[in-house]
């Protein structure tokens, strides 16, 4: 005989099926076929239902068992439907309902709290658990302080622990390292130790600054040595092509002062005598007379030359008049046919004659040599004085041409030899002209 019961959602109905094997015929009897047997089964089912109703209040609090019982009942319902539909040919025995929970089971093992462990151990805590709990409490306290002050520090113990939110009561994962179980005190476990690490970092920063300063001092010394080496190399590389030689510089300076160079250089290099210097002065005056001759032929004196001679009386540009210049002035005056006497009378040159004839300190001769020359020029009278003034005025322009050619080049080969007969003849002829000059204008 098989008993099937429905779930709590359906009405409680029991069906009894009896099979008569004595008659060798499969006769299926419906419920209440026999009064004696059916009554006995009904009473037993009623007792079971009453017990189930009593336990329904308890099973509402027990979530896991109630869910499991409902699943078993649903499965049994599906099995009954298959049985009535005739689909359970292979399996003639339907699935039985799981037995109801025993009311004598203690409540402690049935009720499971949501935040409690699945089992309550009544054993005493061991040394290992106490050490792990102490280390865990220290670590949680240090982490709480760090989060409160918003300080994030990296340490070697961060790899062994997993931080959780503050709302979860600072729980840590079940995976603990070997060092945590032994209760080690790491760098992050104490606040004072963290300060010590910070101090060490600051000291290391100061050391870095010191090393940089020392390196900069060494660098400055190396730069000084390198600069000294470059200066030494530049001194060795000095040559005539780049910086010039002192001899060339000396010659350039001497070219700026040709009167100094003409006297000193010729004495040192050639060794001419004093007579040659007198002849050189005469040749310079000859060059000036050529220019004066051109001026006299035009019949008009150049005012620029006159201003040039009178504007700077103290300049060493002029030369003392010589006999040859006086001779050429007399000849040109007679050819131009103009009165030199009238010009001398109108011009105030005679009064300022001392200022019109400047002296050169280096080229000038000694007082003993100049004195007879002055006497000769003054002995000829007023006419000679005017002609000397003409020669002096031209000498300023002649000196500008001498600046262009500082070295004296004689025009004729006879002038190179001051002791020749030609120069003596010219000197004698000039002396004769001095004696005859007053009679030209009678």
Curated annotation (Swiss-Prot):
The modification Phosphoserine is found at residues 239, 245. Residues 110-130, 394-442 are annotated as: Disordered. The keyword Cell membrane applies. One of its GO terms (biological process) is phototropism. Keywords: Cell membrane, Membrane, Phosphoprotein, Phytochrome signaling pathway. Residues 397-406 have a biased composition (Polar residues). Acts predominantly in the phot1 pathway. Involved in the leaf positioning and also in the phot2 pathway controlling the leaf flattening. Component of the network that modulates the very low-fluence response (VLFR) branch of phyA signaling. Regulates phytochrome-mediated photomorphogenesis and hypocotyl phototropism. May act by controlling auxin homeostasis. PKS1, PKS2 and/or PKS4 are essential for phototropism but not for inhibition of gravitropism under long-term blue light irradiation. This is Protein PHYTOCHROME KINASE SUBSTRATE 2. The lineage of its organism: Eukaryota, Viridiplantae, Streptophyta, Embryophyta, Tracheophyta.
């Amino acid at each position: 005989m098989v008993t099937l019961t429905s779930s709590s959602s359906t009405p409680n109905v029991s069906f009894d099926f009896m099979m008569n094997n004595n008659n060798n015929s499969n006769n299926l009897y419906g419920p209440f076929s026999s009064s004696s047997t059916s009554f006995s089964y009904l009473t037993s089912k009623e007792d079971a239902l009453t017990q189930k109703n009593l336990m329904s209040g308890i099973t509402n609090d027990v979530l896991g068992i109630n869910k499991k019982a409902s699943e078993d009942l649903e499965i049994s319902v599906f099995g009954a439907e298959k049985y009535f539909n005739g689909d359970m040919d292979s399996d003639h025995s339907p699935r039985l309902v799981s037995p109801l929970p025993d009311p004598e089971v203690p409540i402690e093992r049935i009720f499971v709290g949501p935040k409690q462990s699945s089992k309550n151990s009544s054993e005493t805590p061991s040394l290992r658990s106490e050490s792990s709990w102490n280390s865990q409490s220290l670590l949680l306290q240090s982490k709480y302080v760090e989060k409160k002050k918003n300080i994030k520090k990296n340490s070697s113990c961060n790899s062994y622990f997993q931080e959780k939110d503050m709302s979860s009561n600072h729980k840590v994962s079940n995976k603990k390292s070997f060092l945590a179980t032994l209760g080690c005190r790491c760098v992050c476990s104490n606040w004072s130790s963290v300060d010590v690490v910070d101090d060490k970092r600051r000291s290391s920063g100061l050391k870095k600054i010191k090393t940089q300063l020392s390196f900069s001092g060494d660098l400055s010394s190396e730069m000084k040595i390198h600069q000294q080496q470059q200066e030494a190399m530049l001194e060795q590389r000095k040559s005539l092509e780049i910086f010039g030689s002192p001899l060339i510089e000396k010659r350039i300076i001497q070219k700026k002062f040709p009167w100094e160079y003409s006297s000193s250089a010729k004495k040192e290099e050639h060794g001419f005598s004093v007579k040659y210097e007198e002849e050189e002065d005469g040749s310079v005056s000859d060059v000036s007379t050529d220019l004066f001759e051109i001026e006299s032929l035009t019949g008009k004196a150049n005012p620029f030359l006159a201003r040039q001679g009178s504007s700077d009386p103290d300049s060493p540009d002029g030369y003392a008049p010589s006999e040859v210049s006086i001779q050429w002035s007399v000849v040109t005056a007679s050819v131009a046919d103009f009165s030199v006497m009238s010009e001398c009378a109108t011009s105030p040159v005679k009064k300022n004659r001392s200022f019109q004839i400047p002296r050169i300190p280096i080229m000038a001769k000694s007082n003993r040599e100049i004195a007879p020359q002055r006497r000769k020029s003054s002995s000829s009278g007023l006419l000679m004085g005017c002609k000397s003034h003409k020669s002096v005025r031209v000498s300023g322009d002649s000196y500008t041409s001498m600046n262009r050619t500082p070295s004296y080049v004689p025009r004729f080969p006879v002038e190179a030899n001051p002791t020749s007969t030609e120069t003596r003849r010219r000197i004698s002829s000039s002396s004769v002209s001095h004696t005859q000059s007053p009679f030209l204008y009678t």
